[in-house]
Amino acid sequence: MSTTAAGTVPDVTPTRERADVRVAAPAGGLRGVLESSPFPILLVSLVGILLLTAFGPALVVGDTWLMLMAGREVVDHGLPETETLTVLGSGATWTDQQWLAHLVVYGTHALAGIRAVVVLDVLLVVGGLALALGAARAAGATSRSTFLVGLLAGLAGPGGWPMRAQATALPLFAGVLWLLLDAARRGARRRTLLVLPALVVWANLHGSVLLGASLTTVLGVYELVRARRLDWLPLSLAVLAPLCVLATPYGWDVVAYYELMLVDAPFAEILREWQWSSPGGTTARVPSPSARAGARARRPRRRRSRPRSAPSPEPASRRR
């Protein structure tokens, strides 16, 4: 209804047209991801159920028992500095960079047994996957594409499912990535600084913290260059992120550990996972289908100006 000098004039705008004008604002943050992402939520649920029902026993591997043993050493004797558990390595320097992961797994086993360790592993894997999918959705990826890429990632990385020290870092990696992606799109804010305490915890769980620290430093430098002025927030990210790697009880001595693992890995000649990543038959199994699918999606569709001709008969030499 509208009021004029002549009186009240009824609003004759069609109901359908008025309904089209009112567009609901999309929900943001975690709520928006949960409300509009049925496919990623389905994937996370399926992975969790699959791990608990079908792959539960397979999640306990040799590294799991190593974590339990190392965690017991931390509880009984404090942080190790010299190797005393094996004959071949007796007397060698032992920098237990993953001491916190070992302690958490040992404490879980001491409280509720090996089944609780399996449940903890499932929670870590599913939590990391959920955060990664949430980061993709928050960055603008569609629900279906997030589901498909997440499914391919799950098929490509079952080696990361067992209870190992790296499993404890999965939620931290995904959470740090989410914060960095948000800062890259909207600019660094105060909540971006949550990356720093996450890196400190990560530095005591697994050596992959170098990846998170490197990405954080790159973002800080990028924000400084883009702003063309010294802003304390991106400067803090660029300077403090590398220092978070040293925030362990071992302090500066942990540098020698990373040098050994990254430059001169002792098992690189016999274990593939210790080698540098390179294209090969193993790495091409899953990326190849996804790459072909991406190429098809990017290929422009052209309208045919003439009808499709009948296929030519196959040569006799090819039919043999």
Language model features with spans:
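Transmembrane-helix signature of polytopic, membrane-embedded enzymes
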Residues: 45, 132-155
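Membrane-interface transmembrane helices that cradle and orient dolichyl/undecaprenyl
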Residues: 176-191, 293-297
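Short hydrophobic/aromatic helix or loop-helix immediately within or flanking a transmembrane segment
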Residues: 88-115
